[in-house]
Amino acid sequence: MNKLKEEAKNKLIVALDYNNMEDAVKLTEKLGDKISIYKVGLESFLSTDGKLVDYLHEKGKKVFLDLKFHDITNTVKMACANAIRKKVFMFNIHCSNGSKTMKEVSDLVKESGSESLLIGVTVLTNLGEEDLQEMFRSSMKLEEIVLNLANLAKKSGMNGVVCSPQESKKIKELAGKNFVTVCPGVRPKFTLNADNKSNDDQTRIMTPSDAIKQGVDFLVVGRPITKAEDPVKAAEVILEEISEAL
């Protein structure tokens, strides 16, 4: 495997959004060595009693534990302590937990000696301007909110944030190039409709190639691979698109 293909492989995270162990295992077996990082979210974590994380580790894969912890400080810290014990590659908490919680969890990770990346969730990528206005009646624009939360995460010692690809470049300019951006809402060209829009619930989307050009560190892709007629071919197309943009 050449250097660019290896680099592309290390940027792609496949979301195992299944409600049973069998389907998740089948996909990982199909994809084999093509994929090295998988996302385990609420659906797959709860439906497998966390066993999917253990299975992936046994197979030598890295795990992004995407449980988006959001609660009072002590509860979030205790949950994160369990994530640290799982030795996952990265896990996340909501930035809207506030600076105090983010700082205490960041300190917890450092004190434990864990190598896990601690990532903050800014604004979910299925939300747009109208949604935020409806919920918060705020005069701040969506991008302003994302950048503010990312800045708080950086100041609190977090390793990076989950954001949409559109926001990655400005976050890097604000927080530095080593501040990690993890981006769902990545949709390869073959999944877009005639208006270049996604046919699913993601609203702030971008192609893998464009996301890489925006400086995104990790691209999270689920349905374009997991729901594809040929998941292996879909993964190969996405990896090729990433490597061409590097």
In which residue ranges do the predicted regions lie?
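N-terminal amphipathic alpha-helix/helix-capping segment at the start of soluble metabolic enzymes
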Residues: 1-25, 168-169, 173-176, 198, ...
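Conserved anion-binding
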Residues: 6-12, 75-160, 164-167, 174-178, ...
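Conserved, mostly hydrophobic/aromatic
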Residues: 14, 38, 68, 91, ...
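Conserved alpha/beta-domain cores
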Residues: 16-34, 39-57, 73-75, 151, ...
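Catalytic cores of alpha/beta
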Residues: 27, 74-83, 169-171, 191-217, ...
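Structural motif
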Residues: 33, 59, 86, 156, ...
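Conserved beta-strand positions in the central sheet of alpha/beta enzyme cores
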Residues: 36-39, 64, 89-92, 119, ...
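C-terminal helical cap(s) of enzyme catalytic domains, especially alpha/beta-barrels
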Residues: 102-108, 212, 225-246
